[in-house]
Amino acid sequence: MASILLRSCRGRGPARLPPPRSAAPRGPAGDLACLSGASAVGLMSYVPLPLGSCAPVRPVYLSLRADPLGCWTLRPKRACAVLAGPRLLPVRCWHSSRPLGDDSVVEKSLRSLKDKNKKLEEGGPVYSPPAQAAVRKPLGQRVLDELRHYYHGFRLLWIDTKIAARMLWRILHGHSLTRRERRQFLRICADLFRLVPFLFFVVVPFMEFLLPVAVKLFPNMLPSTFETQSSKEERLKKELRVKLELAKFLQDTIEEMALKNKAAKGSATKDFSVFFQKIRETGERPSNEEIMRFSKLFEDELTLDNLTRPQLVALCKLLELQSIGTNNFLRFQLTMRLRSIKADDKLIAEEGVDSLNVKELQAACRARGMRALGVTEDRLRGQLKQWLELHLHQEIPTSLLILSRAMYLPETLSPADQLKSTLQTLPEIVAKEAQVKVAEVEGEQVDNKAKLEATLQEEAAIQQEHREKELQRKSQAAVAQAAKEVEPEVVAEGAPGRPVAELQPEEPAVTLPSEVLKDSAPVLEGLKEEEITQEEIDVLSNACSKLKEQKKSLTKEKEELELLKGDVQDYSQDLQEIKKELSKTGEEMYVEESKASKRLTKRVQQMIGQMDSLLAQLEADQKAGRLGPAAEAAPAGETVISVSELINAMKQIKHIPESKLLSLASALDDNKDGKVDIDDLVKVIELVDKEDVHISTSQVAEIVATLEKEEKVEEKEKAKEKAEKEAAEVQN
């Protein structure tokens, strides 16, 4: 089961775009995508076209005091050769840790408890009271409900087992999983441990025992092999890598498992069902508190993964992103833009809206889909402050806020009414998953029927993605085959029976000078050179692996192990804070951690101790010279390499044009000091490799800037939390 971690979530189908055209004819009225009952957004007619390039769009300034982020445009199509020759396989990304800002179920439960206690202290309502008291059901009805619960539970167990077995079989045979598939697999594992608690004693103890056997039987399941002088070093590094990824996956599974609240009566799930019924069916307006409360459940990843294509196109047009391409490409550029906006919001809140000048205010409002031209400075500051209030204080997801702007609702509507209209446009699958999420956050018993429906809908979406990729692959193969067949036919059309030397070239038609039209636009020769294909991402991964091996660097493993220890510590601290918050209302005795979660936590702690021993053994052997020559680099800069070293390593693996290598190296060297950190480079590769898109070197620079911005925000938040804890300890 944990072998999922031994393969990257990489997509192989490149996202291509149609060639640039003149003004496309607008479609009929049916081509308008109506996002609400009262407003519509006019979209271009979507027609399947051969995939190529698109016209560039103007950049949008997101960072307030940094370089502008350019547009996300794809480059012309180019033939990709198969990478062959080197024995060193690519270093694939693992994607087992949670993305920045992706909170676990326990963290969401803690935040929900803090909000409730804060509202109780302020005297406000925690949630809308029920219209009437619950009536105790008859005994026969309760028995039937219990039987239905177990019936759907067994169905869910059977379907989860089938899906998990199919995904595991694909991984063992060298196939990769998409981001959606991996998220589905993680949820299924958490469900299996929840439905069958004793499964821990059957599966987990044999994971570490069987993984070395699986590595021997299925070598393709490993993301990379190590080209070393010592087989012992290779074995130890593989063992360390396997244990590290397995422990990270188990920790993610622990954080996905919800707490048990014995005092919960299912009120939160019922409240959500009533709320969604009001906005979808009855037309009754829910309270502002209900809208704000349940809007938090529709997270960015959940919303973007389930939006329809017209909605994705509308969001891209609103944010001035490329609106033509595959759904994966549209989601990727929207995800990157939302991540950049999140980091910018926190930086703006720290600096203060009043510290921004007019140009910065216009850039910030424009990047968030709000009016930026033709409005007063006070209006700009007001709408930006409202955005920060909703996003940072009310914790409304960014995707919902931008989607509400894409609907062009009247500006006189309140934020609650805008969110209500936005929620009405979301697909049904989003509501199903949100219903399951609210039960997990509140610690209530998860409805097996709702969980089953959400799992089946997610599986249907995964199968649809597979069909689209297969159709795209067949279409590209057919186009390539047709191009090969056309070339000999054109040559053979010369004049049959006559030698080629006798063929006289046709005289060109005489054209009057007044009729000659000259194109004064510059020819974009370097456009094709800037594209980074999936093959070149593999070459870059190879270069990183080779350079790290030359330096005998274990910094990445050390960093990931420290992050894992931090996740385990944060999880235990969250549990303690939950008990502290519950003690204010006298309910701490009713909420507890599940047995499977406790057992998995003990196993993860044991594996952390084993990995510490492995790291110590590897470092001792390297210093003693038993694993080859010791590294000469200083520990402080062992992962920092020069740009020339990176270029030379890529040249040794695969021939790439010099101009592209220089452009790529310049994009990775953000501070232009001629040095690149290998670990930072690996992070960029992991982010790009798991998406099914092609990017340019300029977009690589934007990704580097976004990651650095997020790291800066994360460091500030950690420093702030540390200062608050120290202040609390001093007061106590």
Swiss-Prot record:
Domain Letm1 RBD: 238-529
Changes after translation: PINK1-mediated phosphorylation at Thr-178, positively regulates its mitochondrial calcium transport activity.
List of residues that carry Phosphothreonine: 178
Main location: mitochondrion
Segments on the Mitochondrial matrix side according to the record's topology features: 216-732
Catalytic reaction(s) noted: Ca(2+)(in) + 2 H(+)(out) = Ca(2+)(out) + 2 H(+)(in); K(+)(in) + H(+)(out) = K(+)(out) + H(+)(in)
Membrane-related topology note: Single-pass membrane protein
Subcellular location, record wording: Mitochondrion inner membrane
Keyword Flavoprotein on entry: no
Protein name in UniProt: Mitochondrial proton/calcium exchanger protein
Subunit architecture: Homohexamer. Interacts with BCS1L. Interacts with GHITM.
Regulation: Inhibited by ruthenium red or its derivative Ru360.
Family: Belongs to the LETM1 family.
Keyword Membrane in annotation: yes
Annotated region described as Disordered, given as residue ranges: 711-732
Keywords of the record: Antiport, Calcium, Calcium transport, Coiled coil, Ion transport, Membrane, Metal-binding, Mitochondrion, Mitochondrion inner membrane, Phosphoprotein, Potassium, Potassium transport, Transit peptide, Transmembrane, Transmembrane helix, Transport
One Pfam family of this chain: LETM1_RBD
Entry coiled-coil feature ranges: 448-478, 528-620, 701-732
GO biological process, one term: mitochondrial calcium ion homeostasis
Ranges that cross the membrane: 195-215
UniProt domain EF-hand: residue ranges: 656-691
Stretches assigned to the Mitochondrial intermembrane side: 94-194
Native source species: Bos taurus
